[in-house]
UniProtKB/Swiss-Prot annotation:
Annotated disulfide bonds: C502-C519, C513-C529
Lineage summary: Eukaryota, Fungi, Dikarya, Ascomycota, Pezizomycotina
Region (Catalytic): 27-461
One GO cellular component, as annotated: extracellular region
Protein name: Probable 1,4-beta-D-glucan cellobiohydrolase B
Organism: Neosartorya fischeri (strain ATCC 1020 / DSM 3700 / CBS 544.65 / FGSC A1164 / JCM 1740 / NRRL 181 / WB 181) (Aspergillus fischerianus)
Residue ranges of domain CBM1 in the record: 494-530
Top EC class, one word: hydrolase
Length: 530
């Protein structure tokens, strides 16, 4: 993931001087603005379909926060440059500077209501803020850690107000639960202030990494007034559940050699921020499934099968080889629910790249056809992604524009110099001139995305064919009906092995189970050999 950053300049009105926490060589915390995390509920479900509400909270990433001198209001960071006196090096900067609390609605345009989070694109208060990145919290000092092997993750989303060039992204990264405080004692802010971010791009635009500033080698961006890159990056595995606007969407696993957060240096980081994209320890490209890119150009968009003019439900299943949470990740499946209808993910129409889910075989075939480097396999493939899912990952909800590639990799032709008829080039209907951040920010400042009704549970537990309430209610959850069918039911050819799928709406694979197993219907969209 890429993201815009935000520098909070001096408050225009005088503030009463408050005592600021700070001592030693450490990344500090300010007290001018109290940090109050907005509440957001989500649900955990059981195999029987019963769901329990959890009282979560969200926190905005540290990169968006005002960074000022300990003891007064002098900026440590203004625009896209560091104060050279306060920040001559990484350690001194961390000692001199404090992260401030956030006013979520007025400064960042982020609001919650019950189980929903709305992110506005451009918010103007004393300064103009562009986009945001927030994390789900377990409590005020700890991120919620989701372990998704042999589970499904479900949420509702409204992308109707996201035009070309924007990305409303919901995804998981293998951050530390405390934001790195226990590993790096100089980090005094921790998860409470949104520290510890990492992803598969090994981002070098972060102002603080591992309890120290990232000022050494900092180069201000040439096209982003708020951002730059430092010598260090922050790497970890990333599972992109949802990257989307109203035109295109993709889901993409990105494994790393080491699943958890590690700091990298210079171009050895790889990814978007380095001259050698594939020189790091993570897969910056991932293995994506974009329905348009896979050949179905009428599946997702305004008025299409999944109609982005209204809210819908997104279901992602993480299926293991043995049907347990300790198994090896073998498949990532996708369903949608809209207006009471379960919609299986579209099938890839390219010859030699079949299916509607992500597997190692799919990724190998897709990379070969599209002539992309198979960096996914190099860094562990599905097994590597599964290792991160097993240890637990943090939920990220964001909205951003793209100063590196104008989001054309998601919603247009990319690379722009290639023919749209070349396999893998066409990703959406947006023009290749679209997505320039300055244009998007000027023409669509009122863009927004809403995430809601998050549920996590065993396969088949978080939704049913009752689907979303188009009138704005939440997705209903009913107890799946379990029935047994005999082997040899009509359908696809071949035999499904133990724990394999053997039926469900849109299923075209085998419906016969290897002996002694039988095909058991968990719900309308999924039957399994048990």
């Amino acid at each position: 993931m890429l993201a815009s950053t935000f520098s909070y300049r001096m408050y225009k009105t005088a503030l009463i001087l408050a005592a600021l926490l700070g001592s030693g060589q450490a990344q500090q915390v300010g007290t001018s603005q109290a940090e109050v995390h907005p509440s957001m509920t989500w649900q955990s479900c059981t195999a029987g379909g019963s769901c329990t509400t959890n009282n979560g909270k969200v926190v905005i990433d540290a990169n968006w926060r005002w960074v000022h001198k300990v003891g007064d209001y002098t900026n440590c960071y203004t625009g896209n440059t560091w104060d050279k006196t306060l920040c001559p090096d990484d350690a001194t900067c961390a000692s001199n500077c404090a992260l401030e609390g956030a006013n979520y609605q007025s400064t960042y345009g982020a609001t919650t209501s019950g189980d929903s989070l709305r992110l506005n694109f451009v918010t103007t208060s004393q300064q103009k803020n562009i986009g945001s990145r927030l994390y789900m919290m377990k409590d005020d000092t700890t991120y919620e850690m989701f372990k998704l092997l042999n589970q499904e993750f479900t949420f509702d989303v409204d992308v109707s107000n996201l035009p070309c060039g924007l990305n409303g992204a919901l995804y998981f990264v293998a951050m530390d639960a405390d934001g790195g405080m226990s590993k790096y004692p100089t980090n005094k802010a921790g998860a409470k202030y949104g520290t510890g971010y990492c992803d598969s791009q090994c981002p070098r635009d972060l102002k603080f990494i591992n309890g120290q500033a990232n000022v050494e080698g900092w180069q201000p961006s040439s096209n982003d007034a708020n951002a730059g890159t430092g010598n260090h990056g922050s790497c970890c595995a990333e599972m992109d559940i949802w990257e989307a606007n109203s035109i295109s969407t993709a889901f993409t696993p990105h494994p790393c050699d080491t699943p958890g957060q590690v700091m990298c240096t210079g171009d050895a980081c790889g990814g978007t921020y380095s001259s050698d994209r594939y020189g790091g320890t993570c897969d910056p490209d991932g293995c994506d499934f974009n329905s348009f890119r896979q050949g179905n150009k009428t599946f997702y968009g305004p008025g299409m099968t999944v109609d982005t003019k209204s809210k819908f439900t997104v279901v992602t299943q993480f299926i293991t080889d043995d049907g347990t949470a300790s198994g090896t990740l073998k498949e990532i499946k996708r369903f949608y629910v809209q207006n009471g209808k379960v919609i299986p993910n579209s099938e890839s129409t390219w010859s030699g790249v079949g299916g509607n889910s992500i597997t190692n075989d799919y990724c190998t075939a897709q990379k070969s056809l599209f002539k992309d480097q198979n960096v996914f396999a190099k860094h562990g493939g599905m097994e590597g992604m599964g290792a991160a899912l097993a240890q637990g990952m943090v939920l990220v909800m964001s909205l951003w524009d793209d100063h590196a590639a104008n989001m054309l990799w998601l919603d247009s032709n990319y690379p722009t110099t290639a023919s749209s008829s070349t396999p893998g080039v066409a990703r959406g209907t947006c023009d290749i001139s679209s997505g320039v951040p300055a244009d998007v920010e000027a023409n669509h400042p009122d863009a927004s995305v809403v995430y809601s009704n998050i549920k996590v549970g065993p396969i088949g537990s978080t939704f049913n064919s009752g689907g979303s309430n188009p009138g704005g209610g939440t997705t209903t959850t009913a107890k799946p009906t379990t029935t047994t069918t005999t082997a040899g039911s009509p359908g696809g050819t071949g035999v499904a092995q133990h724990y394999g799928q053997c039926g469900g709406n849109g299923w075209q694979g085998p419906t016969t189970c290897a002996s002694p197993y039988t095909c058991q219907k968990l719900n309308d969209f999924y039957s399994q050999c048990l």
